[in-house]
């Protein structure tokens, strides 16, 4: 049997509509290899055929509603279970101490049973220390031990939060020169954070020597006027005296009142140190004069 020399060698001829990609069709290597036109056409063709079949009723459209599962009937309680439930409800009586969940916040509080309605299986409890009265189901009442355990858990959580806050405050207030002063009171007078006077250079003269009228640094300056305090930033925690902080780096977070308060405080502190320096120089001058007279 002779085979024809032409053609594709006896293979089944390919249909042009079903060919999505053919390699070596004479295109150059620079052609766009990401051309997905054929894929888009095939997708549109598949979608169109599906819509056509759906329109003719060959495919049933699935509804978006979930299938309803048959409800499970509650298991019938036998007589022994009913007796146990009745016994658990009968154990509470008026005046018993218990723990109840307050409906406002969902927390457990100690309470005392004021009245009981066994027909409705409810009771009225009075919260210890608060005096609030609330109706509760007898099955929802808890023993006082549950309340104690809940308080222990709440106290542990509060202690953990307080320790976390104190740790954050100590890390923020720690400086290279003062690392041991971690615990500081919440409020302090104004002069507690004034900067210390500069150290006295050279040997310091003791009290009682002739010609000495300026002994040591001057007393701390009085608090600034109230109108300065109203413009100043919130007070800093007490502790060793520190230098007033510079103004914030970001100018957007500083309004006119804060900037004015910072400027007035800087003038006030500058005057304090200027007075100390002038007094120190006057002390040195009078000391030299007294030594020359002797």
Curated annotation (Swiss-Prot):
* Low complexity bias (residue ranges): 156-166, 206-215
Q: Phosphoserine occurs at which residues?
A: 4-5, 8, 28, 31, 187
Q: Where is this region: Interacts with GEMIN2?
A: 26-51
Write out the ranges of the annotated region (Involved in homooligomerization): 252-280
Which tissues and organs express this gene's product? Expressed in a wide variety of tissues. Expressed at high levels in brain, kidney and liver, moderate levels in skeletal and cardiac muscle, and low levels in fibroblasts and lymphocytes. Also seen at high levels in spinal cord. Present in osteoclasts and mononuclear cells (at protein level).
Q: Where is this region: Required for interaction with SYNCRIP?
A: 279-294
Sorted alphabetically, which keywords does the UniProt record give?
A: Acetylation, Cell projection, Cytoplasm, Disease variant, Isopeptide bond, mRNA processing, mRNA splicing, Neurodegeneration, Neurogenesis, Nucleus, Phosphoprotein, RNA-binding, Ubl conjugation
Alphabetized SUPFAM superfamilies for the sequence: Tudor/PWWP/MBT
Its GO biological process annotations read: DNA-templated transcription termination; nervous system development; spliceosomal complex assembly; spliceosomal snRNP assembly
Q: What is the effect of changing residue 127 to L/F?
A: Impairs binding to substrate containing dimethylated arginine
UniProt keyword DNA-binding, yes or no: no
Compartments where found: Nucleus, Gem; Nucleus, Cajal body; Cytoplasm; Cytoplasmic granule
The impact of changing residue 279 to E is: Impairs homooligomerization
Q: What is the effect of changing residue 263 to R/T/A?
A: Impairs homooligomerization and GEMIN8 binding
Q: InterPro entries in the record, alphabetically?
A: Smn1 (IPR040424), SMN_C (IPR047313), SMN_G2-BD (IPR049481), SMN_Tudor (IPR010304), Tudor (IPR002999), Tudor_SMN_eumet (IPR047298)
Which residues fall in a compositionally biased region of kind Gly residues? 1-12
**GO MF annotation, one:** RNA binding
Pfam families per UniProt: SMN_G2-BD, SMN_Tudor, SMN_YG-box
The observed outcome of changing residue 267 to A is: Impairs homooligomerization
- Name of the protein in question: Survival motor neuron protein
Species in which this protein is naturally found: Homo sapiens
Q: What's the name of its gene? A: SMN1
